[in-house]
Amino acid sequence: MLITQYLHHQRFSPAAIRLRAMTNETETLTSGIDPASFSSVIKPTNDLFRYVNGPWIDTYRLPDDRSRYGSFDKLAEDAENQVRDILDADDCPATKSQALYHSFLNTDAIEAAGLDPIRDELDLIDSAIDKATLTRVLGTINPAGGPDLFGLAVYGDPGDPDRNIAHLEQAGLCLPDEAYYREDHYAPVREAYVAMVATQLVNAGYAPAAESNGGDELPANTGDDESNAPATVPSEAALDMARHFLAVETKIAANHWDNVATRDSVKTYNPTDYADLAATLKNFDLGSWIDAWQTAYDATKAAKAQPIDFKSVFARVIVHEPSFLTGLDAFWAEADLADLKLWARVHMILGFASSLSRDFDTTNFDFYGKVLSGAKKQRDRWKRAVSLVNGVCGEDVGREYVRLHFPESSKRRMEELVANLIDAYRVSITNSDWLGEDTKAKALEKISKFTPKIGYTNHWRDYSALSVSADALPAENAKAANLYETGYQLAKVGKSVDKDEWLMNPQTVNAYYEPSMNVIVFPAAILQPPFFDPKAEDAANYGGIGAVIGHEIGHGFDDQGSQYDGDGKLNNWWTDEDRKNFEARTGALIAQYNSFVPLQLVEKYADEPDKAPHVNGALTIGENIGDLGGVNIALKAYAFALGKAAGKPDAEEDGSPAAIKALLDTAPEMDGFTGLQRFFLSYASIWRTKNRDELTEQYLQIDPHSPAEFRTNGIASNVDLFYDAFGVTEGDAMWLAPKDRVRIW
């Protein structure tokens, strides 16, 4: 799945005229690239990424409210403004979305309410007299968004992908990943985390603020600017309490699987029934928690619209990290009641902080926005309101977004491109020199069952059960949204998977592959320049959206997707020899990426190079396989498109490297670049981005995507046609010896 989001400014110049087979119209097409923006100092043979993007990176200054900006972010910003216009309109048809939006903007009401929106939940936690009572309290407050010791998600059963099932996953932490609790590198982050938690405990009245020299307590956050308000200074007692909280979370984190282990589709597939699960969580008393949850949920409006039998949800579940549950139960047995209440109290506050008054909201941003991500100021409130709407009921406003901003012609062109990419994968698999015939047959069967979804869903979600109001406080609406989403998801358990349901809104600038359904999905908002431009010659589109399409198809054959068959079932369809060959190739790619350090961190750690964080090749291998396959297959698809345009309908019959190169050589030269060169220049442009150091370091720890420079250079250096395109020779920085180039798809 593509996650990172970035900017590219394009200048289009008319360059060629050709006959479009799709429309039978003569059109003036552009090159789709902007040569004036390229570096005059850096050569593509040494650094393709900075040849295309370096001048922009060197001159662009990140706004204070941004931790990153680039091609994806520019399109996301455009969509954000378009959604805002919809929500601001008097005749907005997305009434639930508009209510959430206006509620979040009512800062006077939010400030007046202070902590009141979650005071009842905190009082319940405080009143627990023993662990049994606390278990019931956690069950009572969980449906509306209370603390989670374990996560619950609903989607297809990998063993029976047509049927929905509950998945139980590790949780219980407020830092991004378990490594933040154990690695020395994150000691400064932990120190800042303690200060933030201590401040929130002061804000909530659980600990005193530090006293000034005159003996008076220092003021809480009350400034006009949300990110520059005078800071509450916690007392030593508050800091001690926060340190204790960190120690409690550290014990939970010790049972977490790391983010590489959680990628293993086989090891995380552990079907379990209620009896076994209850036996595993005997000290926690799962049954008592479920009963309290059911009683609380049944008393809500959401239950009337979406009734749930919560115990039946646990009749059969998939446990992702079994040892986590065992460790969690031991933790619960050994922990003091005071520790558990402290954990629950802080999680309740942090979970709702951004919906509460300024003191809570600002303290939350100062850590999660500034320390972890490097932003210097909070985003404008209306932008946060749009993000809230997109997260809670994105299809409600998304339907209007599609009507106003997505032309059906783009959908038709994308359908053509996707079909071409699938055909190119078919040719690549058929011609593979390392796959055996049995595995080839299964791979071809799988790709024949791929289902592309483009633009928007045909099955819009019904939000009638979502009970939100413009007059309600944001935290109250957040609880209602949690209840709605909980009911919506849990109601699926045991039912057939709705393969028309999307996991992204149409206004999302992203794309994804879902292995359990064998679908590839491309929301409307990504189908714009620099990714897709119907006015550009094919090289730019195949290097842009074509590589993205190829990337998503490639996930069906990466380290995770390759374990699922064409019907979405977790099923080993590989021969042992072919799997061994596959792992040898992916192992070489892992080794390459393990050596990469982003240039900005090379510079940051110049005096201590041994401390510079590296890319985790094992964490990013799935996305790197997707990128590498995406580029190689998009090149083939571009070549076949050139062949068809030249009157060679059987161009796909010969997928040999020589035949592909010959077809690519027929592309017109535009703006001084060949078609093959423009393909790679377009590909590099979609990864144009600039990150703050803090965010780059966070991504290296938790993000399965490699940094943009390596999604460009790390991939291109493994593609033989890149060497042909720019004449890369030994001695150039982008050179990899042929024997060291990884070739998979």
Functional labels for PLM-detected ranges:
Residues 16, 23-26, 76, 251, ...:
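Intrinsically disordered, low-complexity linker/terminal regions across diverse proteins
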Residues 40-44, 158-160, 513-516, 672-674:
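Extracellular/periplasmic catalytic domains that process cell-envelope and extracellular macromolecules
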